[in-house]
């Protein structure tokens, strides 16, 4: 399966309503978010406006730790955005549901203010009840305190 097709299928799966998540999707806004998929070298990543999410597909040979370091750096350089990792060789789960794409190294970029509003809205629902506290802290970082547990 080609990269773009694989990623589009992953996004489709993230948008499926899951009974084991109380009827929520892994990513409740995935089905309505505008996005673009950009294949590039990790060092060439720069913000791209006009989309809810920019999905950067970066080098496969990067380790999860390499991807983490790049994400940390990008978050420092571009504080108005949130960059999140999806490392190919690091599976992530909410309960028993695998949330990562499982094949490509991806860095996702979203507008920080808009993402924070969505997280806050979800925090007023039982959505985050299905997340482990560790995963919640890892993903939400500074927004962790916004979420009412």
Q: PLM features: residue spans?
A:
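Expand to "…catalyze enediolate/carbanion chemistry for C-C bond making/breaking, isomerization
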Residues: 1-149
């Amino acid at each position: 399966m080609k990269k773009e097709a694989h990623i589009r299928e992953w996004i489709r799966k993230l948008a499926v309503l899951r009974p084991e998540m109380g009827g929520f999707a892994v990513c409740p806004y995935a089905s309505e978010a505008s996005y673009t998929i950009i294949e590039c070298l990790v060092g060439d990543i720069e913000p791209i406006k006009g989309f809810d999410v920019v999905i950067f597909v970066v080098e496969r040979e990067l380790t999860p730790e390499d991807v983490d370091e790049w994400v940390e750096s990008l978050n420092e350089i571009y504080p108005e955005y949130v960059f999140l990792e999806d490392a190919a060789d690091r599976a992530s789960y909410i309960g028993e549901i695998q949330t990562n794409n499982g094949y490509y190294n991806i860095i996702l970029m979203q507008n920080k203010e808009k993402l924070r509003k969505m997280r806050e809205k979800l925090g007023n629902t039982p959505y985050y009840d299905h997340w482990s506290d560790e995963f919640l802290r890892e993903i939400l970082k500074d927004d962790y305190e916004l979420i009412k547990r």
